[in-house]
Amino acid sequence: MELAKKEYSKLELKQEVNISISNREKKIGNVSQTINNKAAGQQTYIITEKYTPPTASHIERSKVKEVTVLYRGSTAPTLASGLTPFHKDSLDVWTDWGVNDIPTAIQITNGGGSTVTPQLKTSAETLKQTMKLYPNAQIYVYGHSLGSMNAQYAIADLDKKDIKRISGGFFYQGPNIYSNLTPKQQDTVKAINALDRLFNFIDRKDYVPIGYGIGDPTIGHLIEVESKKAGMVEQHMWGGYQFDKEGNILTNKEGSLQLAKYVTAQQLAAINIMRTSFTKSGGGLSSSEEIFLDAAEALAITQGMKQTIQGEIRALKDVFDKEIENAEELWRDTLSDARDIGSNLYESEILAALAWGGATEPEIVIDTVQDCEKSLVEATKIEQEYDKLLERINEAIKSQLKTDQELAKQIGSMYG
């Protein structure tokens, strides 16, 4: 999400792009292209590990291993841009809203359509050209709001043979454009969805993400965010998102599971690349390298399990809250009915009659609350055990790197 927010920054060519992860700065790369198609309204940043513009040699561009594509969302309309002739944002606002957002939204609310807006077309072309420019790179695509629609469409419009190069797609708070796709594009989406690399985040308290009915197909896994209420604009701009202590977005149970699977798979793939790098000279792994790689794999798997457990715990809390609410309502209704029937009795006599039949507040409410709390305590203990295990694995990795300085140089700051 932090990386997606960068699409609204005024990034310059060659600028280094960093994000904060667990209170540590991580370099994503450098801006190699800034695309500003005024006719269509498309604004996109292309980020590579180091500055490698389209004018670089084919050899240099072929060395690029990762590319991040950031599709910017709509320019927010203001009173000034709406009423002032030749205002600097007037054209952006019109092309974003009048030419792209509103026509697409109308199609979605009417069950879809085949008319493709200019910005979707140019966004698809941008992704294809980027993949040609950097032929050996894995591609990560991000987009928010209108940028989400651009990202969804660009991936759906790829040739099937190219979809394996999409290592991740992250779409936030945009309408579901699946119904606007052609049968061929929908077929491509089904194929890439099977790879579990695309994630479509929505906050249902935001009015912009339309088209996500129960059972409706989507581009990527639908990730429903557990959000808090915010102002209308803030809600759309991630203002309702909530996070755990590790900085992960709080989502529904299914979302936590899908994200944990993806992150674990990405980490294990990176470890396999590292393993290959260690043995490229033709020799086997040193004992130090073997210990490090085993610990790194254990860390990745354990982190994934912990994230899954956290999703289960949040789901349990939702179930228990509902059970407690139902129990409290049952007791209120039971007591109200008893008072109506025994209107001539004292309150103590009504309660005694209910107790004789086994209907007491402790039986109906308090026991339910205690059972739920007991189950949550047990689940939380499991989460705490994962925390302890993660701490031990991290310490083992740091100890190994401290002992083997050569290995530490190879790893860099990955686990530092």
Regions found by a protein language model. Name each.
Residues K160-G215:
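Cysteine-dependent PTP/DSP-like catalytic domain, specifically the C-terminal lobe
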Residues M1-S9:
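Short Lys/Arg-enriched alpha/beta "domain-start" segment
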Residues N150-K160:
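Short glycine-enriched nucleophile-adjacent loop
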Residues L3, V69, D206:
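A residue-level signal for conserved active-site and pocket-lining positions in enzyme catalytic cores
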Residues G143-G147, A151:
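Gly/Ala-rich beta-loop-alpha elbow adjacent to hydrolase catalytic centers
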